Amino acid sequence: MLGSRAAGFARGLRAVALAWLPGWRGRSFALARAAGAPHGGDLQPPACPEPRGRQLSLSAAAVVDSAPRPLQPYLRLMRLDKPIGTWLLYLPCTWSIGLAAEPGCFPDWYMLSLFGTGAILMRGAGCTINDMWDQDYDKKVTRTANRPIAAGDISTFQSFVFLGGQLTLALGVLLCLNYYSIALGAGSLLLVITYPLMKRISYWPQLALGLTFNWGALLGWSAIKGSCDPSVCLPLYFSGVMWTLIYDTIYAHQDKRDDVLIGLKSTALRFGENTKPWLSGFSVAMLGALSLVGVNSGQTAPYYAALGAVGAHLTHQIYTLDIHRPEDCWNKFISNRTLGLIVFLGIVLGNLWKEKKTDKTKKGIENKIEN
């Protein structure tokens, strides 16, 4: 009896690892464009994804499927079975926390954990808000018709109560920070609420998503330092916005036909066949801003080496992109988690390298004094 329970528990842990841990073949998908429009919030895989993507979807969904049945619609409403959106929301936070670390030190693990929890909750809240706004649209699109609200699994009132619960928990996380960060974090709520409306009135909803999804680039630094340093935080925030414009425009090309039919707008429709030049421009702006971040924060060689890898990643991503093949757009889109992790790794190693340089400088000074 105990043996079977232990085996079941081990299988459950393995399912969680498949769904959430980076570096494993089971990379989960689905971005949630902060709120998840029919072409956003819950970024679903294309109609015919490659086998790899399909395996990832099943492994992530297994975590939700193992939950009590009455709970499952709520977990799907917050896209807990599709954690790629949480990663893309979380990574700019890690960049900021890493940059704020003391020279020669690793990032604050407590803050990384706290922001990870907040990312899960706020991404879920954003998806809930989006589905409440978009339930009439979702019913008309095959890909989104099975969302919990559109499918009738959860009523609008139930989703509203659930949203209140998520925001309450997120507030609890926010209250663990300093007063400056509490005020700064509260300021993002308006963006979270209004983003889903942007695709109705503007061809630039991806820009609104970028402003929303990268708020953590400001908040992470202030949580460590007590306030924002504009010389570091603003270019970091700008680089994140450019990054979002890149990956979300690529994703939007999967849904451009549906968007036209149901009257929604996106940068994919705005750029059309000129998408690659636009993405190239965003990439140059992103790398330029990250370079400025490095200069203003005194970064070292590993950081700039990581930027070189990011540049190569973006070049390959854009050069090989086929905007008319949904499966290719999907593969390019999900590769951006790797890109974000490269930036974070470069920040951590660059910061650790500062200690080595400082030690060498101190030894040099000591030798001069002795001589």
UniProtKB/Swiss-Prot annotation:
Regions of this protein lying in the Mitochondrial intermembrane compartment: 105-108, 170-172, 225-231, 299-300, 354-371
Catalytic activity: an all-trans-polyprenyl diphosphate + 4-hydroxybenzoate = a 4-hydroxy-3-(all-trans-polyprenyl)benzoate + diphosphate; all-trans-decaprenyl diphosphate + 4-hydroxybenzoate = 4-hydroxy-3-(all-trans-decaprenyl)benzoate + diphosphate; all-trans-nonaprenyl diphosphate + 4-hydroxybenzoate = 4-hydroxy-3-(all-trans-nonaprenyl)benzoate + diphosphate
Job of this protein: Mediates the second step in the final reaction sequence of coenzyme Q (CoQ) biosynthesis. Catalyzes the prenylation of para-hydroxybenzoate (PHB) with an all-trans polyprenyl donor (such as all-trans-decaprenyl diphosphate). The length of the polyprenyl side chain varies depending on the species, in humans, the side chain is comprised of 10 isoprenyls (decaprenyl) producing CoQ10 (also known as ubiquinone), whereas rodents predominantly generate CoQ9. However, this specificity is not complete, human tissues have low amounts of CoQ9 and rodent organs contain some CoQ10.
Chain segment of the transit peptide: 1-34
Disease field: Coenzyme Q10 deficiency, primary, 1: An autosomal recessive disorder with variable manifestations consistent with 5 major phenotypes. The phenotypes include an encephalomyopathic form with seizures and ataxia; a multisystem infantile form with encephalopathy, cardiomyopathy and renal failure; a predominantly cerebellar form with ataxia and cerebellar atrophy; Leigh syndrome with growth retardation; and an isolated myopathic form.
Keywords: Disease variant, Isoprene biosynthesis, Membrane, Mitochondrion, Mitochondrion inner membrane, Neurodegeneration, Parkinsonism, Primary mitochondrial disease, Transferase, Transit peptide, Transmembrane, Transmembrane helix, Ubiquinone biosynthesis
Protein name per the record: 4-hydroxybenzoate polyprenyltransferase, mitochondrial
